[in-house]
């Protein structure tokens, strides 16, 4: 294994892999390889980030598609790409994705889609916990009352529902774009019932 980490650190990573449920030599090896690369390439993610990335790859089904190593590296590459192309911080992107994992996977969003939202929100100076909660509530409300929410922002109901059912991300973007066209006062009137306890 080509790595810059000392053997003791590799052993610790192997133990981490075991705690995450990797119980074969191959899966532990792949976790150690990916984690060692991520820890060097994305050092500013901080402690525990590789475990979070591994959990995300499992929750979103990437591990089943690409294997332990490649799924983790794909997520790490997404984080690196976004942070290099805007002012978003890597820890914000990963924490946001972690907070969005439950509803994001249920709504069939991809990790790159969620991380793109994270990068945009962080670049605009939003706090991670508040941002994730706001997006979660928006998504839940759109699925709970799609016709009502479409009408509030002037969207054609059937078109919006069809778009939302096809792609959560496309539906959310359609809603947000329509919201932006309303102007600040009307947009706040639409969103305030969802976010009043968040101080937004």
Briefly describe each language-model feature range.
Residues 131, 190-193:
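Acidic/histidine metal-binding catalytic segments
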Residues 194-200:
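Short, intrinsically disordered, charge-balanced linker/junction segments flanking boundaries
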Residues 118-122:
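Extracytoplasmic, non-cytosolic globular domains
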Residues 1-94, 103-112, 124-132, 143-152, ...:
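A short, structural motif
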């Amino acid at each position: 294994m080509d790595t810059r980490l000392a053997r003791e650190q590799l052993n610790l990573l192997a133990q981490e892999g075991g705690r995450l449920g990797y119980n074969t030599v191959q899966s532990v090896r792949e976790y150690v390889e990916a984690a060692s690369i991520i820890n060097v390439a994305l050092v500013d993610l901080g402690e525990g980030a590789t475990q979070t990335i591994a959990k995300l790859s499992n929750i979103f089904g990437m591990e089943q598609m690409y294997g332990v190593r490649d799924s983790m590296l794909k997520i790490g590459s997404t984080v690196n790409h976004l942070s290099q192309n805007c002012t978003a911080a890597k820890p914000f992107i990963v924490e946001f994705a972690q907070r969005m994992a439950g509803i994001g996977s249920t709504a069939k969003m991809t990790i790159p889609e969620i991380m793109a939202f994270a990068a945009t929100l962080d670049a605009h100076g939003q706090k991670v916990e508040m941002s994730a909660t706001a997006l979660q509530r928006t998504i839940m409300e759109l699925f709970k009352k799609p016709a009502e929410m479409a009408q509030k922002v002037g969207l054609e109901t059937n078109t919006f529902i069809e778009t939302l059912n096809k792609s959560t991300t496309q539906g959310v973007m359609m809603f947000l774009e329509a919201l932006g066209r309303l102007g600040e006062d009307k947009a706040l009137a639409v969103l305030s019932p969802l976010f009043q306890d968040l101080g937004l």
